[in-house]
UniProtKB/Swiss-Prot annotation:
Gene3D superfamilies: N-(1-d-carboxylethyl)-l-norvaline Dehydrogenase, domain 2 (1.10.1040.10), NAD(P)-binding Rossmann-like Domain (3.40.50.720). InterPro entries: 6-PGluconate_DH-like_C_sf, 6PGD_dom2, G3P_DH_NAD-dep, G3P_DH_NAD-dep_C, G3P_DH_NAD-dep_N, NAD(P)-bd_dom_sf. It comes from Streptococcus pneumoniae (strain CGSP14). The lineage of its organism: Bacteria, Bacillati, Bacillota, Bacilli, Lactobacillales. GO terms for molecular function: glycerol-3-phosphate dehydrogenase [NAD(P)+] activity; NAD binding. This is Glycerol-3-phosphate dehydrogenase [NAD(P)+]. One of its GO terms (biological process) is phospholipid biosynthetic process. Its EC number is 1.1.1.94.
Length: 338
């Protein structure tokens, strides 16, 4: 692939790791953020120590606070900002951009109040004459591993296969490989909803439960994620792929996962306020839990694990009581759809 110029919006852990992948592939990378100290650190010291204490970035990766300068003559834009500000940043991009580009996003969540997928938000806020079909970049991927060039395989999903293939070629190299998919709803909901199950899996660990319980929450969590996704129009097959079960495994079993760590702390009795303050990073699973719970209620989708986590986070239900309620639900067949 010829050299491309890519704007990466969001200098967090995943945005930084993906910037390095793009730079390794010979592309010009511009990171945009709104914290001058962080941007100066990236440009001066080639580090982003809030996320990666021992990683030195290539000096060709340049960071900006000026959005217009960041977007000038770019071929593609990658959104990697928190879910709650995606719409705001998309509005800023629409007001600044003066030519058509490929639009990608690698964030995982649902808009808290509208319950909308992030690709829908980008479609609503960025006019068609300025963008391609949206491409979702998602899958089992810890930034801490990608940044040290550990093997990573994820998915590029777009309604337009050719656009997904462009992104596949843009990112893929000897340690980072993308597969394409046209099921945007499936890939996007899988990436968002697995964060909820990861919070639950972490809570089980914090409470001292063993591998049996952790395997159960992942398997049954996947079942209810699939039910909601299919109700929204996704293919059930997507949830057996990298962006589905793959991402659920990596997020629901690893200390690298901030959602798993948040759940672990909840299980050990820490308050949500203390957890968020101590982590200093966005825990997407918290806001996504409310959005998914409300969406499931609206669509009539059975999601007992999500409901239990919602009750714990937003209504102060004791975690052990929530587990007891799940274990005493009416008996069902494993493949029962409701």
């Amino acid at each position: 692939m010829e050299k491309q110029t890519v704007a990466v919006l969001g200098p967090g852990s995943w945005g930084t790791a993906l910037s390095q992948v793009l730079n390794d592939n010979g592309h010009e990378v511009r990171i945009w953020g709104n914290l001058p100290e962080q941007i100066n650190e990236i440009n001066t010291h080639h580090t982003n120590k809030h996320y990666f204490k021992d990683v030195v970035l290539d000096e060709n990766i340049i960071a900006y606070t000026d959005l217009a300068e960041t977007l000038k003559d770019v071929d593609a834009i990658l959104f990697v900002v928190p879910t709650k500000v995606t719409r705001l940043v998309a509005q800023q991009v629409a007001q600044t951009l003066d030519h058509k580009v490929i639009i990608m996003h690698a964030s995982k969540g649902l808009e808290p109040d509208s319950h909308k997928q992030l690709s829908t938000i980008l479609e609503e806020e960025i006019p068609e004459h300025l963008r391609s079909d949206i491409v979702v970049v998602s899958g089992p991927s810890h930034a801490e591993e990608t940044i040290v060039r550990d093997l990573t395989l994820i998915t590029a999903a777009s309604k337009d296969l050719q656009t997904a293939q462009y992104v596949q070629k843009l990112f893929s190299n000897h340690y980072f490989r993308l597969y394409t998919n046209t099921d945007v709803i499936g890939v996007e909901t899988a990436g968002a909803l697995k964060n909820i199950i990861a919070v639950g899996a972490g809570a089980l660990h914090g409470l001292g439960f063993g591998d049996n319980a952790k395997a159960a929450i992942i398997a049954r969590g996947l079942a209810e994620i699939t039910r909601l996704g299919v109700a929204l129009g996704a293919s059930p097959l997507t949830y057996s792929g990298l962006s589905g079960v793959g991402d659920l495994i990596v997020t629901g079993t690893s200390i690298h996962s901030r959602n798993w760590r948040a759940g672990d702390a909840l299980g050990r009795g820490e308050s949500l306020a203390d957890i968020e303050a101590n982590m200093g990073m966005v825990i997407e699973g918290i806001s996504t839990t409310r959005a998914a719970y409300e969406l499931a209620q609206e669509l009539g989708v059975y999601m007992p694990i999500t409901q239990a986590i919602y009750q714990v986070i937003y209504h102060g239900t004791n975690i052990k009581d929530a587990i007891y309620d799940i274990m005493n639900n009416e008996f069902k067949a494993e493949n029962e759809w409701s």
